[in-house]
Amino acid sequence: MAHTFSCSADAPLVRTTGGSVRGYRFDGLDIFKGIPYAKARRFHAPEPAVWDSVLDATSYGYVCPLLEMPKPNGEMLVPHRYWLMDEACQNLNIWTPALDDAHRPVLVWLHGGGYFAGSSIEQIAYEGENMARLGDRVVVSINHRLNILGYFDLSDFGAEYANSGNAGGDDIIAALRWVRDNIAAFGGDPGNVTVFGQSGGGAKVTTLLQTPAADGLFHKGIVMSGVLGRLADCTGSGRDCAEALMAELGAADIAALETVPYAALAAAYNKVAPALKAAGKNTGCTPHPNAFYLGDPLENAFRPETARIPLLVGTVFGEFAAFNGFGLNKAQMSAAEAEGFAEKMLGKQTADALLPLFHAAYPEHSAADLPFLDVLFREPTMRYIRRRAETGPVWSYFFNQDFTIEGGRAPWHCSDIPFVFHNTELVPSANISGVTPQLEQQIFDAVLAFARTGNPQHSGIPTWPASTPQQENTMLFDSATRLAPNHDKALIAAALPAISALMARNFDPDSIQH
């Protein structure tokens, strides 16, 4: 296939509120990378970024520094891209079909990695080209501050640090303001913005709903694997952690932490934080409830100002549990062997009690998949959907498709992302003979429909009503996509204690990197 490319000194060129930017045109898309939407001093609120000359927006910008250097991990399952890191990371990328006045729906991607890792380009599947080109949408992805740079409460040390515990969230809002003010020049509709994200990115969507400063900046939300109680808010003062850092670094005052080299700051944090965290102290790295962010809606009420915003919320069958299924080769197991494996993992009494419920909820799955049903995501997501359905429209989905890798593996955390972006061609393990093309189109079209209308219904899937407080109307996406109301309610209630205990032995939430 022949590709087309163009990039001249003055085209494609867009004048933004910060200054002019020049991108490039590739295969029918105008692409802009690394556009600064803000700048900020360490621990302080973001301010608008401005420049005088035309900004070259043809390559990705810096990503936020991490507390530990990333290393390749599970690349066959979740292919990664590693990039240059710097604290000047407030930048965004745009893919658009044309620089016109078409007012296309806008999708703003919030990356995963909890609140302490990841970037807008960390995963190969995050690329926005296919979504923009095939879906006729404007796609935006953003970088923002993370970890102690973005979520470290120093409010005890003065008003200038009042919201340091949510500086990363403040960056996201600055990016959404930039989108509101500029996206029309890129062919997008500032009145039709969907924020969507997976894992930590999905959690950031739920956080925005609880943040008054975000009101009016987005109109729909997609939460993918983003409701997980073990990534809870940071409550209490961050003073103890800050004082421990100052002592470790020999810093005279809190202002000195603003200028110490990041590598030294991160090393000191990694040294002092574990003991403080074990003692129940606030060590940052997740949002800090205050007047800016009003807290987890499962612990507090949904804000009435955002209670009617349409949401699409769901999880993946195996999430993190599925990463433990290496070499199982379940395709070669007999039914008796599969049940024996479940008994080995969960104990015979527990397996005997759960398997009938499991087969009723997931008849297409082997009994060997039961230990890999990730209830730590599914159960809080079910609660979130029920609570949200009391106030506004919410649709439930569940990614249920087995993969052929290693003799058959339940879907894992992030395995749905290539389907959402129509990027399975970039992720070899996502290609399932006879399944992927149709499944990818079903999921992709649901996202496109939701971004346009606030309803994921389209002609390629069964009728999909919104959920109610009494009935979770879940669309199970797999080779035989179907609507499954309350399909696993009894199973999750029964399985939660046993599978949670199994996961607790095998999964450390602080290890999340996707």
Where do the protein language model's features map onto the residues?
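Short, solvent-exposed loop/turn segments at secondary-structure junctions
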Residues: 37-38, 146-147, 228, 317-320, ...
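Serine-hydrolase-like catalytic core of hydrolytic proteins
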Residues: 72-254, 300-323
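Alpha/beta-hydrolase fold catalytic core
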Residues: 347-390, 395-401
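Non-catalytic accessory segments of hydrolases
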Residues: 1-166, 190, 430-443, 452-461, ...
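Substrate-access "cap/lid" subdomains that shape
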Residues: 181, 215, 224-338, 367-386
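Active-site rim elements
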Residues: 78-80, 161-166, 228-233, 289, ...
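C-terminal, loop-rich substrate-recognition/catalytic regions characterized by aromatic stacking residues
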Residues: 44, 306-354, 479-514
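Mobile gating loops/cap/lid regions near enzyme active sites that modulate substrate access
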Residues: 35, 69, 378-514
